[in-house]
């Protein structure tokens, strides 16, 4: 079950600065394709959700980033708007890459919200326009059917299967 994470409030505390630095390090690692460094930013029992990976927990969160960064083609990341308070954070980012299954270029604009605990990311909720993503990744099929539960469900199932295969290959 996905819970909406509130936006951070204004804060000048040392804890808020630490969490802003954590998010900056997270996105710098992402831009460099370093899934291992990204995974290290999460608490062991972290939760992640987005329109594709709707509810990941613990090791699966880090494994998702390891998988995605290891398979990325023509990947470019821009990030901005990093803000944090003592408990929550947010960032905006744009991922540009080639979707391997179709060879089509995707420019995905994402807004992320975070909850922190003990110096790590405890929860992350990424929001983006799934239909827009399907249009870019799948072309005409995405434009005509990408809004439907059927197509979105197939994409989610395929992503979950890919993550499970990756985890098996890694011995997890």
Predicted regions and their residues:
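Short, low-complexity N-terminal intrinsically disordered segments enriched in polar/charged residues
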Residues: 1-40, 44, 160-172
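A beta-strand edge to alpha-helix "cap/lid" segment located at domain peripheries
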Residues: 2-7, 69-78, 83-172
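Alpha-helix initiation/capping motif
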Residues: 12-15, 54, 103
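Hydrophobic alpha-helical core bundles mediating ligand binding, dimerization, or RNAP-core interactions
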Residues: 23-26, 30, 42, 61, ...
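A solvent-exposed, acidic/Ser-Thr-rich amphipathic alpha-helical stretch
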Residues: 35-39, 43-89
